[in-house]
């Protein structure tokens, strides 16, 4: 496995359920336990008014406005995500802007190259920005297919011996905007690894979003933010008309960008604020969980004040075992604080999702590690919509049925070599 880093918001989110017992050396099946959403309902927790309070705080913390009037469609796994993205490219009439960290050679990469080339041939302006490190293995033939049709394909921060530090600062954003009207973002890269149902070995589990409405302007800005590094052309007066985007739904959305600068960025601040604001439950799904001391402390403090904190992380099919080991060095303290940690079993878990109190959801490209919060360019959506948050909580519950929950007593008995590896990897966590 190489390194990597159709849907509805509030309709059917049911997936097939694994009936295996799932017992493993350090875990137990989560089947039979109370679901997060059921637990919240059992305690009579009301989400009424929570979103309004959280909106005020997050706006004050980040300074990023919250835009009402959007439609957010959840897309689960490649078998829903790729057809929706390809259809948007196929239907584009004026412009296609694609930004991605991963673009690998294969069937999926070929399908995207074909659709982008077809769009360019019919007169659509196609701008493709690939991270020079994440997409280093892309076949020249695929790039040539797009360029020969008229698409403008560029690479973000190619290696430069004059600026070696720059090589560690990548764009990890995943953005597609078509006709300045419809946008996509989430965790998916353009590669065969994501092409499937997320329940089969080798088919990565991920979550993406199709966005329409005024907040698409924020996604467009996150593309331009990286594009100008390679082109230095912010917009074309003769072409770009920046239309006023009409209301498309009932979701209020905040588009939060993370940049490769020292200190906490807006994404990091937003996550910490949400942890502090949580009253009932926090659900985190992430591919790479290596929290710093501050975030670890905030999660534990939330649990101690009665918040139900649950983490869903990769299991045996993790694509970066060294990052997983660095995160595992944190598990003992979390488990001792009565925070639930579950590991997804069927395939690599690559989604980046957080929900708080059943009313607010965060979906995007950023993981819960130092690289996402300090080294890389990222983009997340904060969605203020109980229907969207509830749908994601149901996805979380369903994924738990395919996961093993770590047992604290068994985790404490893991081998000395295992603990030593964790500590070694933990020492270099600032680069993960």
List the predicted regions and their residue ranges.
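Charged, low-complexity intrinsically disordered terminal segments
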Residues: 1-432
